[in-house]
Amino acid sequence: MKKTLQRGFTLIELLVVIAIIGILAAVVIGSLNDARSGGQNASIQQSMANVRSQAELVYNSSNYSYTSVCTDQRVTDLLQASLDVVNGTGAINATSPAWSTSTPSGRSVACQSLDTEWVAMAPLAAGDGFWCVDSTGFSGATTTDQTFSASNMDCR
């Protein structure tokens, strides 16, 4: 009689391997979501840094006045890009030097400009607050949705 060796895995061994793969996949997917949110925040921060640069270009080309910063097409395009990262939808209709746009998700972008100063704010991803830039050179996170006025034109 000839003995034959049977090689292979039992059903239990296969189920254990599948369970381990599932646990590892859950950990990796959780890390990927954090990385995605961080990438979205970096995109918003860069768009807002570009708003600051564009505001200075508008200032230099508008007889040294910030009044038209919030109605400048390039500024509104950058703010729209920030809004699209968070919401995927929403439209900015900047017809005055002071405006705010809310979206169906409740997040908003705001911009206000006067002759000597300006401020803009956009929401960060995943409800992490807002990123605000202003004419004083400040660029940073704020935790609340601020209302800007002629007497309150900075992010701090």
Regions from the PLM with identified roles:
Residues 6, 43, 112-115:
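A generic fold-level signal
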Residues 9, 59, 66-70, 118, ...:
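Aromatic side chains
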Residues 67, 101-122:
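Long, domain-scale functional regions
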Residues 114-156:
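Short, surface-exposed interaction loops/tails
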